[in-house]
From Swiss-Prot:
InterPro entries: Cyt_P450 (IPR001128), Cyt_P450_CS (IPR017972), Cyt_P450_E_grp-I (IPR002401), Cyt_P450_sf (IPR036396), Cytochrome_P450_fam2 (IPR050182). It comes from the Eukaryota. The keyword Endoplasmic reticulum applies. This is Cytochrome P450 2C70. Its EC number is 1.14.14.-. It catalyses: chenodeoxycholate + reduced [NADPH--hemoprotein reductase] + O2 = alpha-muricholate + oxidized [NADPH--hemoprotein reductase] + H2O + H(+); ursodeoxycholate + reduced [NADPH--hemoprotein reductase] + O2 = beta-muricholate + oxidized [NADPH--hemoprotein reductase] + H2O + H(+). Residues 1-27 form the signal peptide. Its cofactor is heme. Belongs to the cytochrome P450 family. The keyword Metal-binding applies. A cytochrome P450 monooxygenase involved in muricholic acid (MCA) synthesis. Hydroxylates at the 6-beta position two major bile acids, chenodeoxycholic acid (CDCA) and ursodeoxycholic acid (UDCA) to form alpha-MCA and beta-MCA, respectively. May regulate NR1H4/farnesoid X receptor signaling, as taurine-conjugated MCAs are antagonists of NR1H4. Mechanistically, uses molecular oxygen inserting one oxygen atom into a substrate, and reducing the second into a water molecule, with two electrons provided by NADPH via cytochrome P450 reductase (CPR; NADPH-ferrihemoprotein reductase). Keywords: Endoplasmic reticulum, Heme, Iron, Membrane, Metal-binding, Microsome, Monooxygenase, Oxidoreductase, Signal.
Length: 489
């Protein structure tokens, strides 16, 4: 009996201290639902569709509110104005990344995506410098993309118009493009090592998009229990092994005066700073940075184009207009180039609408404040997690009337010219916007226009029967599996 009394008193004290602490915190943080001990507000959040849950809470608490995903507060930014004020106007104060997600834990504070402070500044600055020197954003990188697209077109022709899943081939293009930048060589599509790497990469994305991954981020203790996160950790180990083998080959042939790719540049930087014990340029940082570049340069492009093909099957009238514009601007025999995009407003609008509509990353990995922040009259302590709902911006019904409808007109003016929108935040915003945005834009345009120049897309079912809803709606909106026929024209 005494034990039960003791436990009852202990639990009562715990609840009192928890609620008192939350009350104190609520005096500083934005408003939000009252959290329960330990579980916080997780029972009010659908981990299969977090953005929808946040939208419902925003209707009650406003565009800036606080939720507890577990025992720690997260400030949520909902809508364009709140996101712009935080991530752009006060970008320096909201520029760190949290370390609770599955991917951030395996990065160990290194690389380009999940590092913070001086590590992030130096690694990102160096990586951008190297990428630019290797032709990123210039004709040089466009030539690499064009070369890889030829391999893709050849592989599509070999399907002979029979039904096929386009996932692998669409992923090969951006993966091989970034491979030439990092490793100085591409992989044959039949290379088993390459296929294993691609399968490994795709499986990691599926795990990251799963509800279990979201729960692990809220309750890190789950990382120590059985679950699919252990499969993720094995895949990360295999990926590191693959990358280290490439690095070892580079070390044997390295010419300090003539770097050929990203690894060479990084190894030379390591050599220059080998006597600096505080150098950010280490072997571990190189491995993680390469993984980050593959992530930034592959998944967004391949999934967006794949989802785009599904939407073009669903809306054949849109496909016909793109092909009409291709015929008018480019013709049948000249290859599309990036210069053509300025003369193809409808195609450009469709590409933007695909990204807006699919909302591939509805809520990017949370950031955290770099210092105590005064924001909209609230006090947000240093290290507080901050979540930006991109869905709320991409689906703003004032900027995009009928946002639930796929309509390229969202990015066209009354004269049919392409219309830019500040609300287009498919690559996030501020200092932590996707480093691969420029490359992804080039690849999407060139892949899609080349496919539609050379093939007619034939669905296996009637367009009205095609379901475009994502199969997963957690961290990522993953397109449903589908097949189609590529009929040569």
């Amino acid at each position: 009996m005494a034990l039960f009394i003791f436990l009852g008193i202990w639990l009562s004290c715990f609840l009192f201290l928890f609620l008192w602490n939350q009350h104190r915190g609520r005096g500083k943080l934005p408003p939000g639902p009252t959290p329960l001990p330990i579980v916080g507000n997780i029972l009010q959040v659908d981990v299969k569709n977090i953005s929808k849950s946040m939208g419902m809470l925003a209707k009650k608490y406003g565009p800036v509110f606080t939720v507890y995903l577990g025992m720690k507060p997260t400030v949520v930014l909902h809508g364009y104005k709140a996101m712009k004020e935080a991530l752009i106007d006060q970008g320096d104060e909201f520029s760190d990344k949290t370390d609770s997600s599955l991917l951030s834990r395996t990065s160990q504070g290194l690389g380009i995506v999940f590092s913070n402070g001086e590590t992030w500044k130096q690694t990102r600055r160096f990586s951008l410098m190297v990428l630019r020197s290797m032709g990123m954003g210039k004709k040089t990188i466009e030539d690499r993309i064009q070369e890889e697209i030829l391999y893709m077109l050849d592989a599509l022709r070999k399907t002979n118009g029979s039904p096929c899943d386009p996932s692998f081939l669409l992923a090969c293009v951006p993966c091989n493009v970034i491979s030439t930048v990092i490793f100085q060589h591409r992989f044959d599509y039949n290379d088993q090592t390459f296929q294993d790497f691609m399968e490994n990469f795709h499986r990691k994305i599926e795990i990251l998009a799963s509800p279990w991954s979201q729960l692990c981020s809220a309750y890190p203790i789950l990382y120590y229990l059985p679950g699919i996160h252990n499969r993720f950790l094995k895949d990360v180990t295999q990926q590191k092994k693959f990358i280290l083998e490439e690095i070892n080959r580079h070390q044997k042939s390295l010419d300090l005066s003539n770097p050929q790719d990203f690894i060479d540049y990084f190894l030379i930087k390591m050599e220059k700073e080998k006597h600096n014990q505080k150098s950010e340029f280490t072997m571990d940082n190189l491995v993680v940075s390469i993984g980050d570049l593959f992530g930034a340069g592959t998944e967004t492009t391949s999934s967006t184009v794949k989802y785009g093909l599904l939407l073009l099957l669903k809306y054949p009238e849109v496909t016909a207009k793109i092909q009409e514009e291709i015929a008018h601007v480019i013709g049948r025999h000249r290859r599309p180039t990036m210069q053509d995009r300025n003369h193809m407003p409808y195609t450009d609008a469709v590409l933007h609408e695909i990204q807006r509509y699919i909302d591939f990353v509805p809520i990017p990995s949370p950031r955290k404040t770099t210092q105590d922040v005064e924001f909209r009259g609230y006090h947000i302590p240093k290290g507080t997690s901050v979540m930006a709902c991109l869905t709320s911006v991409l689906n703003d019904d004032k900027e995009f009337p009928n946002p639930e409808k796929f309509d390229p007109g969202h990015f066209l003016d009354e004269k049919g010219n392409f219309k830019k929108s500040d609300y287009f935040v498919a690559f996030s915003a501020g200092r932590r916007a996707c480093i691969g945005e420029g490359l992804a834009r080039m690849e999407m345009f060139l892949i899609l226009t080349n496919i539609l120049q050379h093939f007619t897309l034939k669905p296996l079912v009637k367009p009205e029967d095609i379901d475009t809803k994502p199969v997963q709606t957690g961290l990522l909106h993953v397109p449903p599996p589908f097949e189609l026929c590529f009929i040569p024209v």
